[in-house]
Every structure is written in C-alpha cells, then in structure tokens.
Amino acid sequence: MAGGEGGVTLGQPHLSRQDLATLDVTKLTPLSHEVISRQATINIGTIGHVAHGKSTVVKAISGVHTVRFKNELERNITIKLGYANAKIYKLDDPSCPRPECYRSCGSSTPDEFPTDIPGTKGNFKLVRHVSFVDCPGHDILMATMLNGAAVMDAALLLIAGNESCPQPQTSEHLAAIEIMKLKHILILQNKIDLVKESQAKEQYEQILAFVQGTVAEGAPIIPISAQLKYNIEVVCEYIVKKIPVPPRDFTSEPRLIVIRSFDVNKPGCEVDDLKGGVAGGSILKGVLKVGQEIEVRPGIVSKDSEGKLMCKPIFSKIVSLFAEHNDLQYAAPGGLIGVGTKIDPTLCRADRMVGQVLGAVGALPEIFTELEISYFLLRRLLGVRTEGDKKAAKVQKLSKNEVLMVNIGSLSTGGRVSAVKADLGKIVLTNPVCTEVGEKIALSRRVEKHWRLIGWGQIRRGVTIKPTVDDD
C-alpha cells in the first residue's frame, strides 16, 4: 500500500496522477478524471430475491466476486457488505453502434485502451467508475441502507426470468427502495437463457403490471444473462445514461463510517516493521487526504469505577489511502475506501473498529448513550411467509423495557426501550455511538430467534457523554 512521496501517487503509472500540492477540492466533481481513474464515485445497490443472481451480475460487470466470507453471520452484527468496483468505458468511434460501444472492466484497468471490435477504430475511454454494494439479505440491506452506512445513489432490481413475478420478497424489495427514497432504478430480468421467448415476454408483462404505481414505475427492464454475460453492455449503457451523477459534498470536513477494520501485520513481524491498523468504509462527505490528522469516535470505550461509560477518542494520522488495489492521495465519497493509519493494529484487528466514525480532528459529532427518537413501524414483518397465521407477521407495538437491535451508521448495538408514547421513544444504548440529531436509525426485534427489521426512526435528541482526553 505504498503511498506516494511528497503527496504524489507513484503506483500504477497507467492511472491518472493525483497530486496533493495542486488539489483544489472546490473544483472536484464525481466525474473528475483524476478521481474516477482510481476510485468509484457512484454507489449502486443490488437488490433481489435469494439466488436470483445478484452476485453473478456484479461479477459479470466488474469481474469481482463479492462473496468473500464464510463466517458471514457468526456474530449477528457484522454483516459484510460486498463492494465491487467497475469502470465503464465508451468507444469514441461514432460509427460503432450502441450498445457495443459500452464496456465494463475492473477498477485497475487503464483509463483508455484501443478498441478490439473488428471494423472500428479509436479508443475506449473511461466515463464512469461505479461501486456495487452487494448485500446478503434484504432486511440487512434495508437496515444498512436505512441507517446510511452506505450512500446509495441507485439500485439494480433483479428478477429471475425462470420464476413467476412477483416472488414473495420482491414486493418487500420495492418497499425497501421506497423507504430509501431511491429514485433511480434499473430492473434486470436475469437468467433469460433458461426460458423461451414467449415466457420472457409474459414475465415482462408481469413485471410491468407489478411495478405500476410503485417507485419503479417507468424503470427500464433489461433482459440479461449474467452467467453468459449477455446484454451486460446494455446495463453499462443504462448506468451511464439513466443514472444521473449524484451531487456530492467535497468541501465539508470529511467523515467516514467504518464498516471493516483489520490488522495487516503477519504474525512474527519485527517491531520496527509493524504497520498501523487499516479501517475500511464509505466516505459520506468531504475528502480525506494522505498525511491528514484524524480522530476516531467513540474510540476506546470503557467503564469507570461506578460503572459509567467512558469514551476516549483515538487520534491518528492517515499514512495511505486505497480503493480496491489502487493507491490514492485523496479519497472522495463513493465506493469502499481503505484508510491506512498509525493506530495500534490491535485496536483494528478483526473488525473491532466497525461502527466507529473517522474524520477530521474536532469536527466529528457528539457521542450518544441514550437516544430520543420519532419512529415508524412497518405494518408487517418482512420476509415472513404466513398464510394462515396473519397475526404472527404483524409488527407489535414497542413495549417498555424490551431490547431491540439498533443500527446507527455501521454500528449494530442493543438498545433498551426506556419510555414510549405514540410515535416517540427513548432508547438506552448498550454501546455509545457517534452520531447526530436528524440521522436515521433502523430498529430490529428478535422474532423466532432472528433479528427482523420492524421499523426505523429519526434521532430527535439524546444524552451525550463527554469524551475523555489524555493530558499529555
């Protein structure tokens, strides 16, 4: 993860150079060439029924397989989001018909390469760099998207062509998209190689009828086969043409939500060769730079002699930044960014920093131990198929003293409901969280041994604790 000397990226000479000396954040856009050469700036969620081919589609577009972890669900808290970045190119030869003039490649591909299509001339040029956020399950997806652990700009809704539409969860996915207020949706009719043309047409009509009156009404429906990579370039074209470039805030103080963290040192490493911990997450706003002093909140959490919670923020410095395998000198919102720091690696190993917020020193929000929220409950549980027993799927009201799982940013923590009336509730958190008034949180309840999403809330106010700082 070699950072450049003197604020210039030295790695990957085939990518655009980043120079901190000439960086002017006020001029950056999500399409600035020196940004999209090395990192993604648009996040696209993939939503769809289990085994309808979400990961396969992501792999077909980006070449990256997002399922990397066997123990995905072991601790019921860290649900690993799979991120995969893809560069989308367009051929600059006007005689080349669409959609063949669009192409997608992995994120370390050069920004320009000569055409290999017979009868065309010119180069494929980089037009977009997108990150696909591949979530394991839809209630997790909703919790993740709801609480803003990942900024979503658009969604791909997958429907398998060899099954009837709608499947039971598909309507919930649409509900999820509505709750998220995602405006830009592409519907992919996958596995088209497994059905006859008449079946595909019939299902196309079903999909049209199904999305009528929902947020997805009018969304393009693209027949594809992810396995055979059929029509993938059409998906690329629609991503470029139908998904507008989102407005991003590059000038505020930077803030990153940590969704992974690790210790990159091998066992038996010499003391002098130890590297600091690495945090991975998505930047919500602002630009992080190599060499910048940073603060991580809530930091190290402990209890004093009276059992009261104490937080000690971690102060450190960024030594390197990277997106997938690309070195960065500065990182903007979009995709998953790895931040190499000087933090003690034991604090970062095995995702210990998940749920923390990293940003500029003195610019991070308060640390809360209790929240007062206005909340909304879903009418029925997601993903529970109950034909006979309608009551089981209905979401019961919040009751005093029950324990919920609360997702705030990337932190999942227990929360005890200490008071509740109409649509307001007070929640005492098991772990302190760095957040601010107005942020959205997701609420889940234990139903038949599983955490199920039951609603979401918005922070009105809360009880904060003052972080302790060493006097050295």
UniProtKB/Swiss-Prot annotation:
tr-type G domain span: 39-248
Chain spans, region G3: 134-137
Alphabetized Pfam families for the sequence: eIF2_C, GTP_EFTU, GTP_EFTU_D2
G1, as annotated region: 48-55
A molecular-function term among this protein's GO annotations: translation factor activity, RNA binding
Compartment list: Cytoplasm, Cytosol
Protein name in the entry: Eukaryotic translation initiation factor 2 subunit 3, X-linked
PROSITE patterns xref list: G_TR_2
InterPro entries reported in the protein's UniProt record: EFTu-like_2, eIF2G, eIF2g_C, eIF2g_dom_2, eIF2g_GTP-bd, P-loop_NTPase, T_Tr_GTP-bd_dom, Transl_B-barrel_sf
Gene of this entry: Eif2s3x
Organism annotation: Mus musculus (Mouse)
Chain positions covered by the region annotation G5: 225-227
Remaining remarks: Encoded by an chromosome X-linked gene which escapes inactivation. Has a homolog on chromosome Y (Eif2s3y).
Function: Member of the eIF2 complex that functions in the early steps of protein synthesis by forming a ternary complex with GTP and initiator tRNA. This complex binds to a 40S ribosomal subunit, followed by mRNA binding to form the 43S pre-initiation complex (43S PIC). Junction of the 60S ribosomal subunit to form the 80S initiation complex is preceded by hydrolysis of the GTP bound to eIF2 and release of an eIF2-GDP binary complex. In order for eIF2 to recycle and catalyze another round of initiation, the GDP bound to eIF2 must exchange with GTP by way of a reaction catalyzed by eIF-2B.
Enzyme Commission number(s) from the entry: 3.6.5.3
Modified-residue entries (Phosphoserine), positions: S16
Self-association and partners: Eukaryotic translation initiation factor 2 eIF2 is a heterotrimeric complex composed of an alpha (EIF2S1), a beta (EIF2S2) and a gamma (EIF2S3) chain. eIF2 is member of the 43S pre-initiation complex (43S PIC). Interacts (via C-terminus) with CDC123; the interaction is direct.
Family of the protein in this entry: Belongs to the TRAFAC class translation factor GTPase superfamily. Classic translation factor GTPase family. EIF2G subfamily.
Lineage: Eukaryota, Metazoa, Chordata, Craniata, Vertebrata
